[in-house]
């Protein structure tokens, strides 16, 4: 089990920086931070995954692309850039079910694992493990990285459930870096246009989608529904 702090969207905080500077001495399970500046300053490993914005822009920012294939365009471009050092793929930008249509043997082999960021983590994990097995890949060689509104208790429960089934890692942000007595706001930053064109994140659960144009969301969903029903 490994954990990393996800601080890319957090305000400047002396407390967060202090925690980062001491965490590396506390436990071997702390592997780094997604804040590149703090990683450099505190001699930590900069670690993270793809952002939703990357998949949204690469897959939907070109009007010639069918947005239901956003994950394919994103993974194809990523692999061309990084070769065999591709890290962790993000699954839920236009739903995990659609992602798995493009997560073929090549990509499943080249990426070291996948990231959960919405929906039921246990259902998602079992679905991913089955997909690896269907492709003939041993899921114990791959990483399931969980990053959806985690605290230590949730992370421990997930780890105990998937231990022995796959490698397990966690990206824990708000709970570690903004653990005040005030309930945190549910705020995220996402791109809404690329090249003058609407783009959207759908997610695996209601309430985590992002787009300013409901007509584009409807169009994207129609494209996905057609693909899921005809391929």
Regions found by a protein language model. Name each.
Residues 96, 119-142, 147-231:
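Gly/Ser/Thr/Ala-enriched C-terminal appendages of enzymes
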Residues 1-127, 132, 157, 162, ...:
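Buried, small/hydrophobic-residue-enriched core segments of structured protein domains
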């Amino acid at each position: 089990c490994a954990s990393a702090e996800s601080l890319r969207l957090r305000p400047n905080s002396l407390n967060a920086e202090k925690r980062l500077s001491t965490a590396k001495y506390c436990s071997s399970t702390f592997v780094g931070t997604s804040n590149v500046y703090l990683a450099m300053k505190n001699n930590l490993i900069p670690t993270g995954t793809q952002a939703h914005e990357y998949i949204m822009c690469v897959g939907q920012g070109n009007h010639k692309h069918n947005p239901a294939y956003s994950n394919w365009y994103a993974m194809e471009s990523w692999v061309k850039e990084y070769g065999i050092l591709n890290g962790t793929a993000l699954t839920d930008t236009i739903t995990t079910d659609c992602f798995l249509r493009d997560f073929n043997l090549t990509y499943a082999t080249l990426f070291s694992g996948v990231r959960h960021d919405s929906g039921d983590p246990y259902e998602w994990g079992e679905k991913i493990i089955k997909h690896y097995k269907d492709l003939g890949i041993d899921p114990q060689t791959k990483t399931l990285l969980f990053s959806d509104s985690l605290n230590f208790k949730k992370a421990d429960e997930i780890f105990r459930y998937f231990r022995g089934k796959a490698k397990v890692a966690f990206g824990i942000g708000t709970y570690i870096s903004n653990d005040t007595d005030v309930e945190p706001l549910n705020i995220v930053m996402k791109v809404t246009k690329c090249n003058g064109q609407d783009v959207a994140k759908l997610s695996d659960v209601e309430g985590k989608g992002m787009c300013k144009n409901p007509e584009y969301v409807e169009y994207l969903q129609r494209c996905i529904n057609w693909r899921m029903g005809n391929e």
